[in-house]
Design a protein with these regions (language model features):
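Conserved class I S-adenosyl-L-methionine
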Residues: 51-58
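A short SAM/SAH-binding and catalytic strip from SAM-dependent methyltransferases
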Residues: 117-129
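C-terminal substrate-binding/active-site "lid" region of AdoMet-derived donor-dependent transferases
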Residues: 128-190
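Conserved SAM-binding strand-loop segment of SAM-dependent methyltransferases
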Residues: 97-106
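Conserved SAM-binding loop
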Residues: 89-90
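S-adenosyl-L-methionine
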Residues: 1-49
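Glycine-rich SAM-binding Motif I of class I
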Residues: 62-66
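Conserved SAM-binding motif I beta-strand of class I
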Residues: 75-80
């Protein structure tokens, strides 16, 4: 653990350091927190504000949630499937004062609240699960059309290839982080958007989840 990591954990009154792969498999990847220096860069981008609701997929012990809640003032929701790690997030919630809340659920089964407008991913699961998660996000979007930003830290080629096939998504920007870590081109946050004006007309669009899932699958 670096001094910088320790400093932030102490400031936020949480314990999130270390890697945990005890329950990892080919579909659900190990717990590894986003480095604080990357979160600082995300904060500096201005993409997360007080009136935003951030959904953190594979939140682990809650580092992203506590940081963005404290530094940006946003409401954050962390989704975690591993009950043991989820309990660690709840323990952090007792000491870290923030607007963060945590849900024990599988990402592909979680109904995305219709006020969520930011989604954060740090390679939490396989691209097969991402297909289903994207369908859930689109279902929420159709129920309440709004601008949503999807942020992918350290994205894999498989993730990028799939995301480029989702018709509803637009590439928005990227936050470069390769200067923070030597020689790794994956050190960046790719940002995709669901624009508010994707559809003509007002009001909710009644699209069943099964239909959305078909729309979001890669060709």
């Amino acid at each position: 653990m670096t001094d910088h990591e320790a400093k932030w954990d102490k400031l936020l009154q949480i314990n999130t350091v270390g890697r945990d792969d005890k329950n990892a498999d080919e579909y659900s990847y190990p717990y590894e927190p986003t480095p604080y220096c990357v979160l600082e860069r995300l904060e500096e981008s201005g993409l997360i504000r007080r009136d935003d609701v951030v959904l953190d997929y594979g939140c682990g012990k809650g580092r992203v949630d506590f940081f963005l809640s404290r530094q940006c003032g946003a409401k954050t929701i962390g989704i975690e499937y591993d009950q043991r790690i989820y309990r660690s997030a709840l323990e952090n919630q007792q000491t870290g004062r923030s607007r963060a809340e945590f849900v024990l659920a599988r990402a592909e089964s979680y109904d995305v609240p219709t006020d969520v407008n930011r989604c954060y991913f740090f390679n939490p699961f396989s691209v097969e699960i991402l297909h289903k998660v994207m369908a859930r996000i689109l279902e929420s979007y159709y129920a309440n059309p709004r601008e949503i930003f999807l942020l992918f830290y350290y994205p894999s080629e498989e993730y990028i290839s799939y995301l480029m096939t989702v018709d509803e998504l637009e590439f928005y920007d990227e936050i470069e982080c390769d200067d923070l870590f030597t020689g790794d081109p994956r050190e960046r946050i790719l940002i995709f958007s669901l624009p508010q004006n994707l559809f003509v007309g007002d009001g909710a669009l009644d699209v069943p989840f099964e239909n959305v899932l078909n729309l979001s699958k890669a060709e």
